[in-house]
A protein has these predicted regions:
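Catalytic core of the metallo-beta-lactamase
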Residues: 1-38, 42-45
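Generic hydrophobic, helix-prone segments enriched in Leu/Val/Ile
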Residues: 26, 36, 77, 97-101, ...
Length: 125
């Protein structure tokens, strides 16, 4: 993935990565291929392997824990998005599937809407 981050070993901290989200819909409009999203997941795996104690997500809703759970959340969201993208006939179906998979997410609805339209080929980005 092309998203740099800083690893601070003395603090066991990851900061500065815009590809880590906390408790909000993930922005996928900039990753329009399965390969790009797979590279993103690989970077998240790389980050998780460091076993950080502190993770400051680049995007998060209020009260999001600043720990490795944000890495796990983002990875699982992307994997769910990939599965639902393949199973959905259009963006409306994809949006509904993601809202069903993540019913508690209230932040980032516009990110989901645009990402679904772009990745289903209904909107140019």
């Amino acid at each position: 993935a092309h998203r740099p981050y800083a690893w601070i070993p003395s603090l066991q901290a990851i900061v500065g990565n815009i590809g880590v989200f906390g408790n909000m819909h993930v922005w996928t409009a900039d990753t329009q291929s399965a390969a790009e999203r797979a590279a993103w997941v690989a970077q998240l795996d790389e980050m998780a392997a460091l076993k950080p104690a502190l993770v400051v997500p680049g995007h998060m809703s209020a009260a999001t824990p600043v720990d490795a759970s944000a890495i796990t959340f983002t990875k699982e969201y992307l994997q769910t998005f990939e599965k639902q993208l393949a199973a959905s006939s259009d963006s409306a179906q994809l949006i509904a599937a993601m809202k069903n998979a993540y019913p508690k997410l209230t932040s980032g609805a516009m990110s989901l809407d645009i990402g679904a339209k772009v990745n289903k080929g209904e909107m140019k980005w």
